[in-house]
Regions:
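Acidic, low-complexity intrinsically disordered segments
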Residues: 1-194
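Structured beta->alpha junctions
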Residues: 59, 63, 87, 103, ...
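Catalytic cores of alpha/beta
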Residues: 92-97, 241, 300-301
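Radical SAM [4Fe-4S] cluster-binding motif and immediate context
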Residues: 138-287, 291-292, 299
């Protein structure tokens, strides 16, 4: 299971280092009869002579070109190559020029099928299972991350999907408009079994469903962890939620201010007007910064 770097000649193993969650999802979905090796190219040099039957590569657009080069190299050696991730999901035909099969969207319900099909010599070109059942979210083995300390944050996910359909964003295309939640008990399980203390929630909006967020934050309090995540600017409207997030170990939030240009708002669907943005920023400065550190950004077009 491989996560490519963008450029193998420019390693950036400084600052906030987050491993590719997709690799650990695939590892958890793989039947025990198979041996799995995770290769984060950020830290591990690829061995093209590795004895293996299947090579699975997960990539974004930023590292897709590198991922394709890796795929081509392994295929030349007769290995079966499967590619997935955001970029291949949106451009599966392009990805198929470099792979034997492409996973479109989520891995649950797909990866197991791929392994069975390979064993039975029935591998298909494209695999896609929309809306997989996240109630059976498989445990992740993060123990090696905690022991080796190559990465300083362990990735977690509590939800997928987003009700907003902003022009610039691929989340809705990949995961749909409906927010799907991973049971809180499963999230707590992964945290406890990881042995780590520092985490990042990869959810696009950690408070996308307030009832679930309260349940999650409450369950995190006794775990004594530190975490950062992403949220919509509406977090500023709920002081009690901010306090609960702080108690649960929140140390920082990344909040997107997609645009400060009134005419662009139709592209993002989150804010009704520039005045909404101004009011929310004032609330953040007055309230949110009392509890947690905030980082903001906006999209430049």
């Amino acid at each position: 299971l491989i996560s490519p770097v963008r450029d193998p000649h420019m390693f950036t193993n400084k600052g906030i280092l987050i491993p590719q969650l997709a690799l650990f999802i695939l590892q958890g979905l793989t039947p025990k009869k198979h041996e799995v090796k995770i290769v984060e190219e950020e830290y591990t040099e690829l061995d093209y002579e590795e004895e293996c039957d299947i090579v699975a590569i997960s990539c974004l657009t930023s590292n897709a070109y590198r991922g394709y080069r890796i795929a081509d190299a392994f295929r030349e050696k007769g290995k079966i190559v499967v590619i997935g991730g955001i970029h291949p999901s949106l451009l599966p035909d392009e990805a198929l020029e470099h792979a034997d099969a492409v996973v479109i969207g989520e891995a649950e319900g797909v990866w197991e099928k791929i392994l069975d099909d390979i064993e039975n010599d029935k591998l298909q070109k494209k695999y896609h299972v929309p809306n997989p059942d996240l109630d059976r979210y498989i445990p992740k083995d993060f123990s090696t991350l905690s022991k080796k300390r190559k990465f300083n944050l362990i990735p977690l996910q509590t939800s997928r999907g987003c009700p907003y359909d902003c022009d610039f964003c691929c989340v809705t295309d990949i995961f749909g408009k409906k927010i799907k939640h991973i049971p809180v008990a499963h999230v707590v399980r992964d945290i406890k079994e990881s042995g780590g203390r520092n985490f990042i929630f990869l959810d696009d909006n950690i408070i996308g469903h307030k009832k679930y967020a309260r349940e999650l934050f409450t369950a995190l309090i006794p775990l004594n962890i530190r975490w950062i995540g992403q949220s919509s600017i509406s977090f500023a409207n709920d002081v009690e939620m901010m306090k609960l997030a702080k108690q649960s170990g929140c140390k920082g939030l990344f909040i997107g201010l997609e645009s400060v240009v009134e005419s662009n708002n139709h592209q993002f669907t989150k804010l009704k007007s520039l005045e909404d943005t101004k009011r929310s920023i004032k609330k953040i400065l007055k309230l949110l910064l009392q509890y947690i550190t905030v980082s903001t950004t906006h999209i430049i077009k």
